[in-house]
Amino acid sequence: MRGPDRRPRGARLGAVLAVSWRRGGGDPDNDNGWQKALDAVHERYEATGVAQVTRTGPLFRLLRRQSNGTFTGVLLDKGPPDYLVASGPFVFRAEAKNTNRPRLPLSMLEDHQAGSLDRWEEQDPRNVGLLLLRMFPARLAWAVLWRDVRLYWWRWHDGPTPTPTGTASLTPATLDSIGIPISPAAPDWLDRVRLDLASECTTGQRR
């Protein structure tokens, strides 16, 4: 099922929003504790040559530089998913999400992010959409292939209002069934996801 591509309207794209951005600090709208843990793992991937990792962010125009590596800019558009990871035959476009709730709200993934992951996978069979998820209080984390969660997301997105009970979020049990559990402190996801994909390619079954 493919839902509509609901991109922001043109008037919103031109809106001026002053933001402060620290080099290497990540998107201030996201939980830096989770992204810093992911960044540390990704730096190791780069250092050992197992993957090339690009940290992406929203488009903006620089207005002025400030002290301590920060600057103020104008936000031009909503950004793509957080990471682009090339490893072996696969190229992953990954979005990181952290929640402090006992269930993962599907609304955390925005329309433009879901649309980007859909288009990414449609372009090439080697392209893989991925969500890197953490529930902070429960100390749980998962790597979830977009194709395994997209049905939940589009069903919620295109469903009736008010949302039926239990359909607007995912429980840890559901994430255990559709995702790959990883360490919330040292989220080394690449080998396990590649093994899962390789097993499916050779046997037709998921590990």
Say what each PLM segment does.
Residues 83-85, 89-101:
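Conserved catalytic cores of phosphodiester-cleaving nucleases, focusing on short active-site segments
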Residues 2-16, 21, 170-207:
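Charged phosphate-binding loop/patch that engages nucleotide di/tri-phosphates or the phosphate backbone
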Residues 54-55, 93, 130-133:
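A structural signal for short, well-ordered beta-strand segments and their strand-loop junctions
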Residues 118-151:
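Nucleic-acid nuclease catalytic cores
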Residues 76-80, 87-91, 112, 124-126:
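Short connector loops at helix/strand junctions that flank enzyme active sites
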Residues 99-123:
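Mg2+/Mn2+-dependent nuclease catalytic core
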Residues 144-167:
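Short, electropositive alpha-helical surface patch
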Residues 1-74, 203-205:
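Acidic-basic catalytic patches of nuclease active cores, encompassing PD-(D/E)XK
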